Amino acid sequence: MNRKYIPFGLALLFCLTPFVSSPIALVIGFLLASFGLVPTELPIASFTKKLLSYSIIGLGFGINFEQALSVTSDGIGLIIATIVGTLVIGSLIAKVIKLETTTAYLISSGTAICGGSAIAAVAPAIRAKDEQIGLALATVFVLNSLALFIFPVIGHALNLDQHTFGTWAAIAIHDTSSVVGAASAYGEEALTTATTLKLARALWIIPVALISAVIFSRGNKENGSKKLVIPYFIFWYCAAIAFSDFFPQLEVVYHGIFTIAKQALVVCLFLIGCSISISKLKSSGPKPLLFGVTLWVLISTTSLSWLVLR
């Protein structure tokens, strides 16, 4: 038996436990790949693609549709503006710094909607490679970690009220977990506002993934490929949201499915990390992180300015 199976198998089992978060799983996979401990004969790429789709569908059971639609009109308007603005500005910045299109689009999608979940949903629609997904996720996770500590400090320094901070956190912080962490540190009202707006923001995974499939299929046609990749799992994601909304009495079951889906996503990130190595990171250079930071700072400062000066 290939000796690589032992450390790989142990790491995989460890990622199945609740003690491992998504960023840690990505790092574990990255370390295994960097030390040459990933069995090359395993169909990791194809398995990861399928598991990602199932994970996203499962996450749909954790979306409260009515609560997501109960946000204020001002919040919805700002969310729409920042999502569209982020994708457009991201495209322009990518051209300026000459960053590879797919990686840039994944980072933009994660920044625009809800971090890692958005990247995982959009990736199959645009035929992103594991290496590109990994770079985008790593960039988003780094910025998430910074936001968790920086945002409350900025909020107190500017004396932001609870509602304003909650709205800002929901718009400018990528992942829901970091939004909840930063908002809860600021106050209960901020937490309620941030959570509700973030749920509404998460619903945009659906149209963005579908539109992305069309946009990138046109680009593929120019390169000789005529196939449109339709992310069918998005329709099942919608079905999961609708089903849980129509039958709320099964909330315990939905919570269980959502928990399993989140853990499956952790495993996905471990497998994606297995496709990244130090040599691949060196070849990509600092551009992905530079792109992510620039886009994040622009969206954060613009949305904060609008909230404070309106």
Curated annotation (Swiss-Prot):
Q: Give the main localization category.
A: membrane
Q: Which residues cross the membrane?
A: 7-29, 44-63, 75-94, 104-126, 133-155, 165-187, 199-218, 228-250, 257-279, 289-308
Q: What does the similarity note say?
A: Belongs to the UPF0324 family.
**Protein's name in the database:** UPF0324 membrane protein VP0936
Bilayer topology: Multi-pass membrane protein
Q: Which domain of life does the protein's organism represent?
A: Bacteria
Which Pfam families does this entry report, sorted A to Z? Cons_hypoth698 (PF03601)
Q: Lineage in the entry? A: Bacteria, Pseudomonadati, Pseudomonadota, Gammaproteobacteria, Vibrionales
Which compartments is it annotated to reside in?
A: Cell membrane
Xref: InterPro entries = UPF0324_pro
Give GO cellular component annotations, separated by semicolons.
plasma membrane
Q: Does the keyword Transmembrane helix apply?
A: yes
Q: Which UniProt keywords apply?
A: Cell membrane, Membrane, Transmembrane, Transmembrane helix
